[in-house]
């Protein structure tokens, strides 16, 4: 049960990082086409930054070395 919880946090963190990457890539492609809305691009950049910070915190919540160390102690 604990391993399933750890995998859920890791999957959620990775999916948020992928979402942030998609948002930032979309913002860069909007800027390269010379859109007239610079505010929309900055909103996408801030949303990507927030999602990436949350994803990194979720990924770092459970460290895989800690899990391996607990298994070795048993």
Curated annotation (Swiss-Prot):
Tell me where the transmembrane regions lie: 11-31, 40-60
> What domain of life does the native source organism fall in?
Bacteria
Q: Keyword Signal on this protein?
A: no
Per the record's keyword annotation, is Cell membrane included, yes or no? yes
What kind of membrane protein is this, topologically?
Multi-pass membrane protein
Cellular compartment(s): Cell inner membrane
Q: Name one GO cellular component term.
A: plasma membrane
Task: Give the keywords, sorted.
Answer: Cell inner membrane, Cell membrane, Membrane, Transmembrane, Transmembrane helix
User: What task does this protein carry out?
Assistant: May act as a membrane anchor for the tetrachloroethene reductive dehalogenase PceA.
Q: Which family does it belong to?
A: Belongs to the PceB family.
Name used for this protein in its record: Probable tetrachloroethene reductive dehalogenase membrane anchor protein
Q: Which organism is it from?
A: Sulfurospirillum multivorans (Dehalospirillum multivorans)
Gene name in the database record? pceB
């Amino acid at each position: 049960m604990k391993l399933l919880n750890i995998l859920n946090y890791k999957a959620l963190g990775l999916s948020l990082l992928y979402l942030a990457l998609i948002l930032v890539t979309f913002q860069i492609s909007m800027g390269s086409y010379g859109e007239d809305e610079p505010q929309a691009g900055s909103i996408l950049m801030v949303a990507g930054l927030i999602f990436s910070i949350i994803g990194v915190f979720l990924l770092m919540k459970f460290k895989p070395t800690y899990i391996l160390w607990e298994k070795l102690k048993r």
